[in-house]
């Protein structure tokens, strides 16, 4: 039985705390001659603006409010900032207590006592998790005024005027004030004529070839960011076209405008000025024309040690690269050559330099490489560069061990062990061999097996990774090395004992991975993905899937049945009676009423789907577009496409291996097992929208559908979709929503189509503690398969009325490197209820679903 007291007690405590905090004095820690900043008001040309970009230029922010109260400030005020000083004064004025404590401890320990947790630790903790009062700082107000003026000048309002005003609030809100910033923008300036002044002919020729990509456009409003972007573009352009010594400081923009506001001439004349190279030698400054640099010699040092004399190393020439090594070259020269994007005679390029770093990292056998460029010996013109690449190898072998303690509703206690072994540079081509083993051993008291650890799951896999595309045809033009390609060949097995139906799973995979265009996007191409699932103990089905058993038992209890079917209480025996009951009905030796036939077929269909041995041979293509520019990117977006097909290859190979099933249909088999045939497509989109400096909206949408055809009437259980759970529709537990309006009557409800929409507002509460408000919409349906029940099916857009909608709130504690998450989801619109009764009418805590997870759901 679910315990509802704990959540109710928590809500009661929060309510009491809220009432107590509301009685607090917000200005308790504000000096008497100062004011608490209550609000910033920003007006642009007389109209109030809430534009986050503009408001962010106001340096001082008021304290944060939750439910109309500055709770973080109240918590801070509960702490005494002078706890140590007050304790020292108390000791001085109470000599008796001083003597007692000195006798109990020592004089030094009494002095340290004021820094202890008992004396000042609680106060420090309250102030650490709380928020200090935003005491109005007039210096920061005036600085904010200057920053606002600078911002509007940066977007073309050169004649703007910004003033600030401070308003103290009425006495009932003592020592509180608001600040008003009033901005008059004036006319905006626009770019007019665009000219260039370039002293180096070689620089000018490159500029002219790429000038169409400029950020500066005639007629566009002045934007300082456009000039910054143009400077970065030109710097990258020249550095990637041979100008090794090019300095960003050589790029300047001369902007001429009418400084007399009364003239109202808002056109700007812009000259892009690219000067010469400036070199400093002490106090001597010289200038030189920029010139193109070419790569001369390329030297690569494997297993480099700066303590070893380079002259003692052996070397080998491979194409235009000289490879140095000690004693024995452990890597194929071809692999090292292709990992290097630099080529003799090519112009110097920062991009190729970066590609070389990435490609060596992709080999996974070297630590981060070191690279240096020097002028070639006897190069009096100084336009030839020798490239030296220094590599340091990782350990040939590595071993990692893991362990964990487990507990669940099924398993009383258990432990898991794992080991991972890696062998690098296996065939001298930077290949990596990985061996992984996982074992979980647990105790399940309900089993007849009397051993303490009576359940287990053991799995192992072997993986071979090649740092290139391994394919009979040459793919280098289609997938060059700068896309950091990989080929993964993997095989694995898992073995369950006394868990569910005791599955034995065998899998194999040939996968290609590469990063097109930039390192953010990713392609995953599974040329072949084989999976065989063998259920060893299907007779245990009705012991595991209790909801399905109850449905069948409810049908059986309507009839007078003998010991062949039921026990002394009249219930079907799970191991034998259930199967005898279904078989005898299908064979005609036992009859039931017509109204029970369809539910019985549903149970039989469920049994067949879950106990079927699955044989899947699939191919898939996944493309991921990722905009993430930094680890904490609040403008993050990601779009993932996936298409998958299974069974077509086997259908061509095994066309002659046909069997006739009892229903008269013809199915192909391979190795005695019917193989799956289906087509699958998925689209997943995630987008984050900043709302303020510390809060943002997170949106996710998902659409997936898998259509069986040919050799299959439905898709395998392992390839189906489910709804509910910690990262999906949080008002329902996993597998407890759908399909459609069916009411989720089974233990594990799944289907072959899924639609999900999630919207979540994330905001700060106290320090590392964050909050969230969310809405989840979606469901699963059956489409184009052999499902008999209309409530399960997606027929047309009218079926969208059967989505489930949940709302809720969550708490997250951010440890920087991971997040602990607790979400409380409420089923707000339940498709299982009749039309007209689906919206929640009364909140009940027992219907709330608590979801615990690690990291954000999307």
Predicted feature locations:
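C-terminal motif of bacterial Sec signal peptides marking the signal peptidase cleavage site
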Residues: 20-23
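Interaction-mediating elements
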Residues: 25-362, 479, 497
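Outer-membrane beta-barrel pore domains and translocons
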Residues: 167, 273, 339, 343, ...
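Outer-membrane beta-barrel initiation region
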Residues: 289, 294-479, 596-599, 605-635
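Repeated loop/turn-to-beta-strand initiation elements of outer-membrane beta-barrel proteins
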Residues: 366-369, 396-399, 425-433, 468-474, ...
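Hydrophobic, lipid-facing positions within transmembrane beta-strands of outer-membrane proteins
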Residues: 385, 413-419, 456-462, 487, ...
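Outer-membrane beta-barrel "beta-signal"
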Residues: 813-817, 844-858
């Amino acid at each position: 039985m679910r315990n509802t007291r704990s959540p109710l007690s928590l809500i009661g405590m929060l309510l009491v705390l809220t009432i107590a905090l509301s009685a607090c004095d917000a200005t308790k820690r504000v000096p008497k001659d100062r004011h608490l900043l209550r609000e910033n008001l920003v007006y642009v040309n007389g109209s109030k603006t809430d534009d986050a970009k503009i408001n962010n230029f106001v340096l001082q922010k008021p304290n944060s409010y939750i439910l109309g109260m500055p709770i973080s400030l109240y918590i801070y005020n509960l702490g005494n900032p002078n706890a140590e000083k007050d304790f020292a004064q108390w000791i001085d004025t109470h000599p008796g207590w001083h003597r007692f404590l000195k006798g109990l401890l020592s004089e030094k320990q009494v002095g340290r006592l004021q820094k202890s947790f008992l004396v000042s630790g609680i106060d420090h903790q309250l102030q650490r998790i709380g928020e200090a009062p935003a005491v109005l700082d007039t210096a920061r107000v005036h600085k904010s005024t200057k920053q606002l003026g600078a911002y509007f000048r940066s977007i073309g309002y050169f004649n703007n005027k910004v003033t600030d005003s401070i308003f103290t609030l009425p006495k009932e809100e003592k020592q509180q004030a608001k600040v008003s910033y009033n901005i008059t923008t004036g006319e905006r300036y626009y770019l007019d004529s665009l000219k260039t002044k370039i002293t180096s002919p070689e620089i000018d020729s490159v500029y002219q070839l790429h000038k169409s990509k400029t950020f500066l456009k005639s007629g566009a409003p002045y934007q300082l960011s456009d000039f910054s972007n143009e400077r970065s573009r030109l710097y990258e352009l020249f550095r990637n076209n041979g100008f090794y010594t090019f300095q960003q400081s050589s790029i300047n923009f001369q902007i001429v405008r009418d400084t007399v506001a009364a003239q109202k001439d808002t056109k700007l004349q812009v000259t892009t000025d690219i000067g010469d190279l400036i070199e400093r030698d002490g106090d001597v400054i010289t200038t030189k024309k920029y010139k193109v640099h070419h790569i001369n010699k390329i030297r690569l040092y494997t297993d480099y040690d700066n303590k070893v004399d380079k002259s003692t190393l052996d070397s080998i020439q491979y194409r235009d690269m000289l490879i140095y090594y000690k004693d024995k070259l452990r890597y194929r020269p071809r692999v090292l050559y292709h990992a290097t994007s630099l080529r003799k005679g090519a112009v110097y390029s920062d991009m190729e330099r970066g590609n070389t770093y990435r490609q060596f990292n992709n080999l996974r056998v070297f630590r981060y490489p070191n690279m240096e460029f020097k002028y070639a010996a006897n190069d009096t013109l100084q336009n030839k560069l020798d490239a030296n690449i220094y590599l340091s190898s990782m350990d040939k072998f590595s071993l990692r061990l893991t362990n964990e303690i487990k507990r669940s509703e099924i398993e009383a206690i258990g432990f898991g062990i794992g080991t991972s072994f890696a062998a690098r540079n296996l065939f001298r081509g930077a290949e990596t061999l990985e061996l992984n083993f996982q074992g979980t051993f647990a105790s399940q008291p309900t089993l007849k097996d009397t051993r303490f650890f009576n359940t287990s799951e053991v799995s192992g896999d072997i993986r071979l990774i090649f740092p290139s595309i391994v394919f009979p045809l040459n793919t280098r033009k289609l997938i060059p090395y700068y896309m950091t390609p990989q080929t993964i060949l993997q095989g694995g097995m898992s073995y369950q004992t006394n868990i569910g139906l005791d599955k034995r799973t065998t899998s194999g995979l040939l996968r290609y991975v590469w990063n097109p265009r930039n390192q953010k996007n990713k392609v995953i191409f599974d040329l072949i993905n084989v999976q065989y699932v063998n259920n060893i103990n299907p007779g245990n089905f009705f012991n595991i899937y209790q909801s399905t058993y109850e449905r069948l038992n409810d049908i059986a209890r309507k009839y007078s049945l003998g010991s062949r079917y039921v026990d002394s209480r009249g219930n079907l025996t799970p191991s034998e009676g259930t199967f005898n009951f279904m078989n005898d009905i299908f064979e005609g030796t036992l009859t039931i009423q017509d109204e029970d036939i369809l539910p019985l077929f549903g149970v039989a269909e469920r049994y067949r789907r879950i106990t079927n041995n699955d044989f899947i041979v699939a191919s898939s293509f996944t493309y991921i577009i990722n905009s993430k520019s930094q680890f904490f990117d609040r403008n993050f977006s990601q779009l993932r496409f996936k298409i998958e097909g299974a069974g077509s290859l086997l259908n061509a190979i095994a066309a002659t291996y046909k069997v006739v099933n009892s229903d008269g249909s013809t199915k192909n088999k391979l190795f005695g097992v019917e193989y799956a045939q289906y087509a699958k497509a998925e689209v997943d989109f995630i987008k984050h929208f900043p709302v303020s400096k510390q809060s943002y909206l997170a949106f996710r949408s998902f659409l997936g559908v898998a259509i069986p055809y040919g050799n299959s009437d439905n898709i395998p259980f392992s390839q189906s979709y489910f709804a509910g759970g910690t990262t999906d529709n949080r008002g329902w537990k996993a597998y407890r929503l759908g399909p459609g309006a069916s009411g989720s009557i089974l233990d594990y409800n799944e289907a072959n189509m899924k639609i999900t929409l999630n919207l979540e507002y994330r905001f700060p509460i106290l320090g590392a503690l964050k909050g969230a408000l969310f809405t989840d919409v979606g469901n699963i349906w059956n489409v184009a398969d052999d499902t008999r029940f209309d409530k399960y099916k997606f027929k047309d857009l009218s079926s969208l009325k059967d989505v489930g909608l949940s709302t809720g709130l969550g708490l997250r504690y951010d440890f920087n490197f991971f997040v602990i998450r607790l979400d409380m989801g409420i089923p707000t619109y339940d498709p299982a209820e009749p039309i007209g009764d689906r919206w929640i009418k009364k909140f009940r805590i027992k219907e709330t679903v608590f979801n615990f997870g690690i990291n954000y759901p999307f």
